[in-house]
Amino acid sequence: IMIKDPDLDDFSTEEAAELFDNIKSDFHQLEDAIASDQFPNSNYKNYIDIQSLVKFLIVFDLTHNMEINHPKSTYMHKDETGKYFMGPIWDFDWAFGYEGNRIHFQSFNTPLFKLITPNSKGYYFFTRIMEDPEVKALYKEIWQKFSTESMEPLLEYVDFYSAHLTESQAKDYQVWS
């Protein structure tokens, strides 16, 4: 667990250690509920907002962002309800066929969830959640609404902004290629 906010450097060593332990313990309760033999009837939905989770998964599906399998760059936050919410989303360097050979988009059936390493914690976390029939149903519902109402505006948005990024993209390739 990495903590962005609150900044633990703003606390004494003892306070920071206690805060870190509390956050870690809280997150372990979510993980334990997901790993429970009682899943999906465990209380895991008391810890995480399913709607934000499903929208997060749809974004990763659309972009085929393999980062989800070992999420070192996955943000979650809590609101006043005490539940975890996914986002904001970022770190898409493992998306859109990130490999030089673009293998992820050469095969339509390459799974998003894939054991990249034995420690692919995201793989275990997210595949387990996708076993919940309620999550699957919500995924289908949100996807159907998105694909019929929002896909076309998204594609128009991408086309519009890609024209503005052409020069920047060329400079980026010069620096990073």
Label each region the model flagged.
Residues 1-70, 74-177:
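Middle-to-C-terminal accessory/interaction subdomains
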